[in-house]
């Protein structure tokens, strides 16, 4: 069976690209189609033939392919997939609208329908600059139409969480299998990690005192709500380590001033990230994610999660065993959750029991389990 693998753009190694790399392992002889590809920024695809759409040939097409998202429905339809029996797309909007025959099977692993034109439009619009706001207003209906239309080319949807499955049902009117993304649980479960952290530029070393700080890890983008984690810890006088970069970093650093309890480390190596997880009191996860790999990584390292009880985290954290949820999407809600975590009695004080529960839960999200469940979902009738 000749197979084609599709991904919207391959220009960085983030969560969606890690899923796609796992699909590449599953289908080592498959050809890859994408709107833009940077071979030096994406790993795991060197053995595959990679074909780009015309988007890559446009000005800045490889550097900022998202600027051409409005053209991607047309680019997707022009991909020549006639020779393939099975088409597997890894998708959040602008690649699944392909042209296919009725005897070709198209399975879409959906990270989410286009959040920025559907239920998260307001959040993305608020965070966009003037040009972005204008583009969103102009192209929203256009992209909604093509997102709905492109779903017609899919024979089987596979969602990355129950949260996304519900969104697929609400927007596309389609049922989905649920297969959680693969997480490198074995790496983060390895208990041999250091006790200090070096910033990405190598300039500073910050000691990690086990159990003395909370951790935020992820991009510093508005919808992930790092501001809530920072403000809650400032209000409560708690130590917080922030790992990750993004547009909000400068603003967040200014907001804390000379508060020595809040440390921004920027991007760090995987080894440092593992140490950060393993030595944290708990991970703070105040955003709504489609799935959210970070909480699983933290649990693999034996660290519990304090999270807003919405989104994919409902699939990955066991309340009362590997973390706790709060319902009010405010700084006050997070402060209350942190207080509840700290006064929760022996439940969270028995570190070895909590760590064992976290690691056992994280094992459910291994790459091996992902590949096994994907094989079942991709099979006809799956």
Regions found by a protein language model. Give the residues of each.
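Conserved acidic donor-binding segment of nucleotide-sugar-dependent glycosyltransferases
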Residues: 319-320, 324-331, 338-350
């Amino acid at each position: 069976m000749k197979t084609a693998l599709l991904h919207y753009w391959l220009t960085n190694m983030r969560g969606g690209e890690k899923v796609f790399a796992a699909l590449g392992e599953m289908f080592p002889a498959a050809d890859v189609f994408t709107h833009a590809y940077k071979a030096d920024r994406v790993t795991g695809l060197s053995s595959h033939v990679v074909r780009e759409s015309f988007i890559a040939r446009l000005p800045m097409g490889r550097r900022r392919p998202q600027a051409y998202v409005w053209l991607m429905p047309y680019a997707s339809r022009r991909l020549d997939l006639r020779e393939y029996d099975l088409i597997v797309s890894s998708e959040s909007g602008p690649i699944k609208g392909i042209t296919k025959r009725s005897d070709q099977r198209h399975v879409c692993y959906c990270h989410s329908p286009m959040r920025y034109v559907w239920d998260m439009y307001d959040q993305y619009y608020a965070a966009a600059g003037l040009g972005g706001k204008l583009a969103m207003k102009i192209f929203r209906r256009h992209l909604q139409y093509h997102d709905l239309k492109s779903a017609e080319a899919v024979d089987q949807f596979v969602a990355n969480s129950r949260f996304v499955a519900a969104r697929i049902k609400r927007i596309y009117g389609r049922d989905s299998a649920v297969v959680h993304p693969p997480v490198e649980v074995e790496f983060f479960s390895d208990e041999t990690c250091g006790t200090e952290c070096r910033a990405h530029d190598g300039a500073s070393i910050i000691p990690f005192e086990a159990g003395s700080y909370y951790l935020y890890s992820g991009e510093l983008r508005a919808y992930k709500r790092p501001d809530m984690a920072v403000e809650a810890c400032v209000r409560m006088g708690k130590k917080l380590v922030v790992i990750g970069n993004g547009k909000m970093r400068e603003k967040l650093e200014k907001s804390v001033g000379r508060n020595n309890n809040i440390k921004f480390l920027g991007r760090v190596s995987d080894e440092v990230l593992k140490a950060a997880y393993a030595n944290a009191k708990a991970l703070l996860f105040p955003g709504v994610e489609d799935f959210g790999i970070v909480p699983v990584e933290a649990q693999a390292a034996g660290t519990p999660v304090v999270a807003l009880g919405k989104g994919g985290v409902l699939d990955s954290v066991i309340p009362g065993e590997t973390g706790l949820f709060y319902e009010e999407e405010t700084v006050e809600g997070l402060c209350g959750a942190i207080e509840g975590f700290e006064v929760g009695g022996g439940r969270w004080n028995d570190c070895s029991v909590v760590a064992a529960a976290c690691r056992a839960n994280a094992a459910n999200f291994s790459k091996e389990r992902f590949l096994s469940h994907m094989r079942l979902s991709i099979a006809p009738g799956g």
